[in-house]
Swiss-Prot record:
UniProt cross-references to SUPFAM superfamilies, sorted A to Z: Nucleotidylyl transferase (SSF52374)
The name this protein goes by in its record: Uncharacterized protein MMP1471
A Pfam family it matches: HIGH_NTase1
Family: Belongs to the TmcAL family.
InterPro entries: HIGH_NTase1_ass, Rossmann-like_a/b/a_fold, tRNA(Met)_cyd_acetate_ligase
Species name: Methanococcus maripaludis (strain DSM 14266 / JCM 13030 / NBRC 101832 / S2 / LL)
Signal sequence annotation: none
């Protein structure tokens, strides 16, 4: 846990430093990518964002589909090692990058710190990094549903999607496409919408989506349970052999690589710091009603009702990170301040 705390603090400082935009290596990395593209005689640069928590057969299926279009770059979040659900990833991004490379990715790049951002914030970061990587193709797996078929047709016709509660529509034609989308399909619509919103920032960038229906029979929850229990026999049908090998290479030390929450940091923040600097006003005011917290569960009980489980966990991650809201805003504004390549289990800037 001590090494994990040190890594967390290093990531925290990295985010703060990037918010200042003190240096920028984007052009150098773009040259590296172009050289790799030429070396592999690839027609396009394919960019995909996936958490790989861990990398399973569904990810491998989409990766193989994307690789058929060109040089495949996996963008993996990211500093602090907290997922979009606000909880610690199973293993750190360097191990997840190794899984991606062994599964067939040509390059793995570090993405944004999802666990301390709202969905709109990290989606904005994703589109910015896709553009910085000069991505030509964005492959996405989708779940079949009627509204999604209309969304795909609209995007394939060169249009963009607008998302509002109970109103999924085409921006260009103003046609209503449906009322709701399954959460993973919603991500695709949100990507399209964010590309439209940021188009003035990247007037020469016009990426194309490539869609493939997701395969069934894979449960991330069951996979993580199998890893926790060191029971790979029960989950081997859902994982590429390369992912299983990465885990098995740790042998009896497997439990040591499983990431955990730094609860002491969370409690120290909530009990001793000005919460207005880190949290939305309505949440900080509610938490300030109690003078002292003794557990994470107590904190969760005081977070206002109406927030999703993921939002609650992201609040805990914000307390854990202890990075001021203003710093996060500057980080997003400057993103990506740098492009960091994750090469196997080593991090090279």
């Amino acid at each position: 846990m001590e090494d994990e705390i040190k890594s967390f603090e290093k990531d925290r400082n990295l985010i703060i430093e990037d918010s200042k935009n003190s240096k920028n290596n984007i052009v150098d990395v773009q040259k590296l990518i172009e050289a790799l593209k030429d070396e592999k005689n690839a027609k396009n640069i394919v960019v995909d964002f996936t958490e790989y928590n861990p990398l399973h057969n569904g990810h491998k299926y989409c990766m193989d589909f994307g690789k058929s279009e060109g040089l495949f770059i996996s963008v993996i979040p990211g500093p602090l090692e907290r997922s979009g659900r606000g909880i610690p990833y199973l293993v750190n991004r360097h191990i997840r990058a190794e899984m991606a490379l062994l599964a067939g990715a040509d390059l793995v790049v570090e993405g944004p710190p999802m666990g301390i951002m709202g969905s709109g914030q990290y989606m904005q970061c994703l589109i910015k990094i896709f553009s910085a990587l000069n991505g030509d193709i964005i492959p996405r797996g989708y779940i079949e549903e009627e509204t999604m078929e209309r969304v795909i047709n609209s995007i394939n016709n060169g249009n963009h999607i607008k998302i509002k509660p109970y109103n999924i529509s085409c921006i260009e034609t103003r046609e209503k496409l449906g009322e709701k989308l399954e959460i993973d399909n919603y991500v695709i619509a949100s990507m399209s919408y964010t590309i439209y919103k940021l188009k003035e920032n990247f007037p020469k960038w016009n990426p194309k989506f490539k869609f493939i229906e997701r395969i069934e029979g894979i449960s991330g929850t069951k996979i993580r349970e199998g890893v926790f229990n060191n029971n790979f026999e029960s989950i081997k049908h859902m994982l590429p052999i390369t992912t299983i090998d990465v885990f098995k290479n740790f042998g009896d030390n497997l439990s040591e690589i499983i990431l955990k929450r730094n609860e002491e940091m969370v409690l120290d923040t909530v009990n001793n710091f000005d919460l207005n600097k880190y949290l939305p006003e309505n949440i900080s005011e509610k938490l300030n009603e109690k003078e002292y917290y003794e557990s994470i569960e107590e904190i969760k009980e005081y977070i206002p009702r109406g927030f999703s489980k993921n939002n609650i966990e992201r609040t805990i991650s914000k307390l854990e990170a202890r990075i001021e809201k203003e710093t996060i805003s500057k980080y997003i504004e400057n993103y990506p301040a740098n492009l960091r390549i994750l090469n196997g289990i080593n991090n090279h800037e």
